Amino acid sequence: MGEQRPLALAWSPWHDRLHRRLHQHPQLLPQRQPLLLAVSGGQDSMALLVLLQELQRLHHWPLNIWHGDHGWHSGSAVIAADLRSWCQQRDLPIQVDQAPQGSTASEASARHWRYSQLQQRAEELGADVVTGHTASDRAETLLLQLARGTDLAGLGALRPVRPLFNDSPDGAQLRRPLLGFSRADTAAVCRDLQVPIWHDPSNQSPAFARNRIRAEVLPVLEQLHPGCSQRMANLAERTSQLRDTQQELSQLALQPLRTSTGLDRRRLGALQPSTRRQLLVIWLAQQGVTALNAALLEQLTDRLALSAAGGSCDLPGGWRLQWQGDNLSLQPPAAGH
């Protein structure tokens, strides 16, 4: 249970820092845009909440709060009740949803449930979703992506703004205004502004890969190279910007390759492997194929070389890529896949 201390809402250097960032990057949280804050009760999301509540009078966002009770530990219902009471005392509208038993057994399933609930609530409110992800989260994600195997998009993960769901680009957006703050910063925000924090013991569980990165890997790297977490977060941001540039240039390069049935396989195959891979990723994503790992992309890049024979390849989601002669085409999943 969080320590119930009085809330000291006042302008602080933390408010000034975020306010300046929002003026420099107005697309992060557009003024008057309804916002749905995903609040766990931990230090990052509570810092986000208290900063945006005070900045609301300048930026005029309608604010709503959402909390998801995953049921991962015996005290989760108490945290949900305490957080609801805390918000209600401050006239902050909050919705608390409880996950069905067994629906959040893994990190992936929990994330799917959480984001599905957020999407539903955001659509009801006409709001965008805001999370308290920090530069520290970005460094952890970079390490996880490197360990799993990734491409440029994976290295630039945790973008400041993106669609909540990739297959709904015109739907609710996911916004992360605290990527310029570290986890140490959010702890200081909560301390300086006397904001309560509810500690979730599942964040310490070694069963989750991110927790082990946070507790076992990053501390060692920080001892060896102090400040490395922030440098990794900065690298992720630069990579994200580089990818945006690459995407725009690749769109221009893709136009001459398009045919009535797909792509000109010979013109694609004559390109350098790295260019061929990038254009293939963009074209497939436009068709709805996104879950491609680095190993499969390398395999396809080699098999689509000009000197390679015709062939086919099954892709995630039931898609099938086929190529023969000049033609490269994509077959959609069978009905009911």
From Swiss-Prot:
Database matches in PANTHER family: TRNA(ILE)-LYSIDINE SYNTHASE-RELATED
TM annotation in the entry: none
Protein name: tRNA(Ile)-lysidine synthase
Record organism: Parasynechococcus marenigrum (strain WH8102)
Record: residues binding ATP: S40, G41, G42, Q43, D44, S45
Localization, UniProt: Cytoplasm
Job description of the protein: Ligates lysine onto the cytidine present at position 34 of the AUA codon-specific tRNA(Ile) that contains the anticodon CAU, in an ATP-dependent manner. Cytidine is converted to lysidine, thus changing the amino acid specificity of the tRNA from methionine to isoleucine.
Gene3D superfamilies per UniProt: HUPs (3.40.50.620)
Pfam family, one: ATP_bind_3
Similarity annotation: Belongs to the tRNA(Ile)-lysidine synthase family.
Keywords, in A-Z order: ATP-binding, Cytoplasm, Ligase, Nucleotide-binding, tRNA processing
InterPro entries named in the record: Rossmann-like_a/b/a_fold (IPR014729), TilS/TtcA_N (IPR011063), tRNA_Ile_lys_synt (IPR012094), tRNA_Ile_lys_synt_N (IPR012795), tRNA_Ile_lys_synt_subst-bd (IPR015262)
Any GO CC annotation of this UniProt entry: cytoplasm
EC number(s) stated in the UniProt entry for this protein: 6.3.4.19
Reaction(s) catalysed (UniProt annotation): cytidine(34) in tRNA(Ile2) + L-lysine + ATP = lysidine(34) in tRNA(Ile2) + AMP + diphosphate + H(+)
BP GO annotations: tRNA modification
Molecular function in Gene Ontology: ATP binding; tRNA(Ile)-lysidine synthase activity
Name of the top EC class for this enzyme: ligase
Domain notes: The N-terminal region contains the highly conserved SGGXDS motif, predicted to be a P-loop motif involved in ATP binding.
